[in-house]
Amino acid sequence: MFPIFLQMAVWRPSETKVYLPPTPVSKVVPTDAYVKRTNIFYHAGSSRLLAVGHPYYSISKAGNSKTDVPKVSAFQYRVFRVRLPDPNKFGLPDTNVFNPEQERLVWACVGLEIGRGQPLGVGVSGNPLFNKLDDTESSTIANQDTAEDSRDNISVDPKQTQLCIIGCTPAIGEHWAKGTACRSAPPAQGDCPPLELVNSPIQDGDMVDIGFGAMDFKTLQESKSDVPLDISQSTCKYPDYLKMSADAYGDSMWFYLRREQLFARHYFNRAGAIGEQLPSTLYIKGTNNRDPPPSSVYVATPSGSMVTSEAQLFNKPYWLQRAQGHNNGICWGNQVFVTVVDTTRNTNMTISATTQTLSTYNSSQIKQYVRHVEEYELQFVFQLCKISLSAETMAYLHTMNSTLLEGWNIGLSPPAATSLEDKYRYVKSLAITCQKDQPPAEKEDPLAKYKFWDVNLQDSFSADLDQFPLGRKFLMQLGVRTKPSTTTKKRSAPSSSTSTPSAKRKRR
């Protein structure tokens, strides 16, 4: 006999991880999928836009909270909020363009040109009390900082920037600000605060990065002497290209133009107590006044270098064929946001005025002033488009932006009331409680709390493209050549004549 061994089967779970597919999300549809473009184009342009002010700070007279001289600097963002007419209320040459019961009209931006006036110039910014200890580029033997105040009068020519961002919502900026410390480890007085990256819309008048970083200098530099005057109490923002490029709908940035340039001109170190001591393993201990070592907090002053007309982004047309996001130039809300920075026209004009008539030169009797001026002009070419009011399209637009349907006078039906409501017959009777008429709620502007330069183009649309510089350039792109009319009208016959009419020849 042979022994028979029976082995029990034991089930063991698989050690291989199983990855489940992610939960399906709603797909973002590009505007070209539901927007139908027509062959109707319009030109719209602004007037000459001027700004004059002090380049470093705003000025208010004593005892007056009103700003008498605003701050106008080339290192500020210029954010133009361009308002367009409602195409559904627009007087169209052809009334058969669309069916108002089944379609709605929108504008599409297909071309623009940002005009800049004033000559090229290099602007200088600085601080009369700049935190500078040693010239670490060409320094003699550096010793300990023994003076209580070693600040110096330093000026720089900041970073050179040309920037243009186009979209139908404000551009998004980023900067570093003071964060919130944990309650378990609160910082002591004089400790380095925690940092936090903050995103916020770029507003008109916000400061651009000039070479000292994108940060909130008012809260992170309490000495007020680490940067030039124009940003020492301001926040420098840098466009968050990553966030705007990843925007699902692509409204904040259809496309952008950018050119930045700088190099380090001088190298200094900061005066003051070192908050984080230099590790002893990184150096050999010195003698006399070289122990401990001098300040190791270094800073470089930027320089934007030469400005030239060969590297200009402005005063030339740009045509939008394909946007970087899903919004291919559709102006939702009948508005366009143009964010501009141009530091190549940065001349700060110095103005002098004498307090009395001078026979000999005396600087104490001459007052010096500084002003900065800016000049802009905006031109656009818009294309008329229409959207079919299908159920799928309206549901998608309501998910994207619920205010669009309200602007088109399309409302969603409210749910049916489940409770019994009271309705009086005689509403104005004195026998019942007062029935106050509730006025309709005014439509609030969600961007009213932000500051923009409003440009109203509602009365500037024209279908005669050949009458405007940008319109003629656009027609050249399409290969359309307009010929001037050379036909002359015939002179009308005089109503009365003093000459004797000639006798008609009789036909024989």
From Swiss-Prot:
Record-level GO cellular component terms: host cell nucleus; T=7 icosahedral viral capsid
One Pfam assignment: Late_protein_L1
Gene Ontology molecular-function annotations: structural molecule activity
Gene Ontology process terms (BP): endocytosis involved in viral entry into host cell; virion attachment to host cell
Keyword annotations from UniProtKB, A to Z: Capsid protein, Disulfide bond, Host nucleus, Host-virus interaction, Late protein, T=7 icosahedral capsid protein, Viral attachment to host cell, Viral penetration into host cytoplasm, Virion, Virus endocytosis by host, Virus entry into host cell
Biased composition (Low complexity): 481-502
Record's function text: Forms an icosahedral capsid with a T=7 symmetry and a 50 nm diameter. The capsid is composed of 72 pentamers linked to each other by disulfide bonds and associated with L2 proteins. Binds to heparan sulfate proteoglycans on cell surface of basal layer keratinocytes to provide initial virion attachment. This binding mediates a conformational change in the virus capsid that facilitates efficient infection. The virion enters the host cell via endocytosis. During virus trafficking, L1 protein dissociates from the viral DNA and the genomic DNA is released to the host nucleus.
Quaternary state and interactors: Self-assembles into homopentamers. The capsid has an icosahedral symmetry and consists of 72 capsomers, with each capsomer being a pentamer of L1. Interacts with the minor capsid protein L2; this interaction is necessary for viral genome encapsidation. Interacts with protein E2; this interaction enhances E2-dependent replication and transcription activation.
Stated name of the protein: Major capsid protein L1
Source species: Human papillomavirus 30
Annotated gene: L1
